[in-house]
Amino acid sequence: MLKTNQKNVHAFEIEKQEPEAVMEFLEKNHALLQYFLIIFKYDIEPEVKVILHKHQLLFLETNRPLNGRHIKTMSLKEETNHSKPNHSKTEPKTTIYERHIRSGEEIYSANHLIFLGNIHNGAKIISEGCVSVYGVCEGAIVCFGECLILKEVKSAQIVFQNKILSLKEVERLLVNKNIKIITKNDDILDIKEVL
């Protein structure tokens, strides 16, 4: 009997563009991209493949359309213009972790997640819901929810709604220990500090 395992995968789809832009993206974000399948919607150039192999990134070349759930956010203006609420979609539950998340520990969840302890370097959090971290965050965070709340950040490995935070955006999180709320309006990332 054939032994198989079924896995859920988060992926980045890359459309056809200049190889230099793709190589720069891969070099800059290779540490975070190790957690994703990278799907190229075209035949990859040899120089791009060199970067993929160099960082041992998992990738797929295909022209076939892929089914799956696309992460789509609705602006606050669109949300408030609805005349009646949509109750057909169930709201994710909230899971609270009062303990520290240790190095090497991985948490995958469809729920909203609240962390009262620290997330240590080498830990990985992936959530379909919102994520709130009130301890020190040194690990990798991948949040597909409406918002990401962070207090003391010491990590550059943060993905919010399929966008890898740039060094400039991460630096805004590192300046102090105040709570920061990250949201996204269209493709614009908004980082607000709560005093």
Swiss-Prot record:
<comment type="subunit">
    <text>Interacts with MinD and FtsZ.</text>
</comment>
<keyword id="KW-0717">Septation</keyword>
<keyword id="KW-0132">Cell division</keyword>
<protein>
    <recommendedName>
        <fullName>Probable septum site-determining protein MinC</fullName>
    </recommendedName>
</protein>
<dbReference type="Pfam" id="PF03775">
    <property type="entry name" value="MinC_C"/>
</dbReference>
<dbReference type="GO" id="GO:0000902">
    <property type="term" value="P:cell morphogenesis"/>
</dbReference>
<dbReference type="GO" id="GO:0000917">
    <property type="term" value="P:division septum assembly"/>
</dbReference>
<keyword id="KW-0131">Cell cycle</keyword>
<dbReference type="InterPro" id="IPR013033">
    <property type="entry name" value="MinC"/>
</dbReference>
<dbReference type="InterPro" id="IPR036145">
    <property type="entry name" value="MinC_C_sf"/>
</dbReference>
<comment type="similarity">
    <text>Belongs to the MinC family.</text>
</comment>
<comment type="function">
    <text>Cell division inhibitor that blocks the formation of polar Z ring septums. Rapidly oscillates between the poles of the cell to destabilize FtsZ filaments that have formed before they mature into polar Z rings. Prevents FtsZ polymerization.</text>
</comment>
<dbReference type="InterPro" id="IPR016098">
    <property type="entry name" value="CAP/MinC_C"/>
</dbReference>
<dbReference type="GO" id="GO:1901891">
    <property type="term" value="P:regulation of cell septum assembly"/>
</dbReference>
<dbReference type="InterPro" id="IPR005526">
    <property type="entry name" value="Septum_form_inhib_MinC_C"/>
</dbReference>
